Design a protein with these regions (language model features):
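Active-site entrance/lid segments in N-terminal catalytic domains of soluble metabolic enzymes
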Residues: 1-125
Length: 125
């Protein structure tokens, strides 16, 4: 076990976050990562809210470890984003956004549910 600020924040035992690799970031993979001590991530981009909920519920049934939700924001309909993010934030301790700056209203939804908002960047430039 390696304790860091990251492990303290997300509740994992090793400071590793699974890369949310599109369709490969399934509930089974995320739960395996969480069982190994890392932060598992389920990619929920493009799914309706009930599928987001079902995928995260499935991952949580497979592991007691922390499992987050990932949104590739270029593929999320802005009109449905609040409902999707709320469904994820109710079930995941971390909600991760990628590619564009997350809308502050979405971050507020995440925080209101008691989850952490994370912004994945593609490069330092």
């Amino acid at each position: 076990m390696l304790t860091t600020r990251f492990t303290d924040l997300v509740g994992c035992t090793v400071p590793i976050q699974q890369a949310p690799i599109g369709g490969c970031a399934s509930p089974r993979l995320a739960s395996a990562v969480a069982e190994a001590g890392g932060l598992g991530m389920v990619s929920v981009t493009g799914d309706p809210p009930e599928v987001v909920a079902a995928q995260l519920d499935q991952a949580r049934q497979l592991s007691a470890g922390p499992i987050g939700a990932h949104f590739f924001m270029l593929m999320v309909d802005p009109d449905s984003a609040p409902e999707l993010v709320a469904a994820a934030a109710e079930r995941a301790p971390v909600v991760d956004f990628f590619y564009v700056d997350p809308d502050p209203a979405l971050v507020e939804i995440v925080h209101a549910a008691g989850a952490l908002a994370s912004w994945q960047i593609g490069s330092a430039e």
